[in-house]
C-alpha cells in the first residue's frame, strides 16, 4: 500500500505559492516610475490594466502581448510611445490572429488602439495615469505633438 509522506505536503505549499506569484505577473508601482517616463515593461503593465476592462479574453490560453515592436533602427515606431500587439495563437487552426495594435505614452500612460484610433479608458486606468503624470510632471496637453504622430484625433 502507498503511504503519503506528511512532509511532502509542506513542500508542496511553498511551491504552489511561488508558482501563483510567478503567474500573477508584476503590478506597476507608480513610485518606481522615473521622471523620464515609463520603461517598456512598465508601459506593458499599463496596457494590461487598460485591457482588463475591454472585451478581450486575456485569460484564454494562447493570448499574448508582443512588446518588441520597433522600426528599422530598433526604436519604437511612434516617438514617446511604446507599441504592443495583442493577439491569439489558435492551436487548433495553427494560426495567429491579431486583435489590436496599442500605443502607450511613456509620459502619461495614455493608451490608444491605433488601428481604430480608440483611446482606452476606465477608472482604474485613469487613476494609474494620474499617478504616472504626477511622477513625470507631464499632462495629456503636454504630449499633444507626440500624439499627432499616432495619426489619431483627440477624442472629446
Model-derived regions: residue spans:
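Short, non-transmembrane alpha-helical segments in secretory-pathway proteins
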Residues: 28-72, 135, 139-142
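Exposed beta-strand-loop-beta-strand "reactive/processing" segments of non-cytosolic proteins
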Residues: 59-107
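Cystatin/cathelin-like cysteine-protease inhibitor module
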Residues: 56, 61, 99-102, 106-133
